[in-house]
Amino acid sequence: MSEEKKVVLSREYVINLRRAYEVSRTKRAKYAVGLIRRFVARHLKVEPKAVKIGQLLNTALWARSIEKPPRKVRVAVEKYSDGTVKVELKE
């Protein structure tokens, strides 16, 4: 039987992405995704592989091309009973 995932924890964060501007221009958006993944993993005590980035958040990071991701992003984070974490853009 398939077990339905239940939300164990729900939080909102404002993640500062200014460190993405310290890397090469052609790697900034990809690095920003990694920053978000590592930030959420550290705060919710999970592995970075368990963090799933939402489609709207990914689109917002890549909207101004790879060279100019946003400086900050407000996100809503949900941790599920199976240990996975979903990160969505908070509007």
UniProtKB/Swiss-Prot annotation:
GO molecular function, one term: structural constituent of ribosome
Gene that specifies this protein: rpl31e
Entry superkingdom: Archaea
GO BP annotations listed: cytoplasmic translation
Stored InterPro entries: Ribosomal_eL31, Ribosomal_eL31_CS, Ribosomal_eL31_dom_sf
Pfam families: Ribosomal_L31e (PF01198)
Signal peptide segment: none
Entry-linked SUPFAM superfamilies: Ribosomal protein L31e (SSF54575)
Protein name, entry field: Large ribosomal subunit protein eL31
GO cellular component, one term: cytosolic large ribosomal subunit
Family of the protein in this entry: Belongs to the eukaryotic ribosomal protein eL31 family.
Matches recorded under NCBIfam families: PRK01192.1-1 (NF002258)
Natural source organism: Pyrobaculum aerophilum (strain ATCC 51768 / DSM 7523 / JCM 9630 / CIP 104966 / NBRC 100827 / IM2)
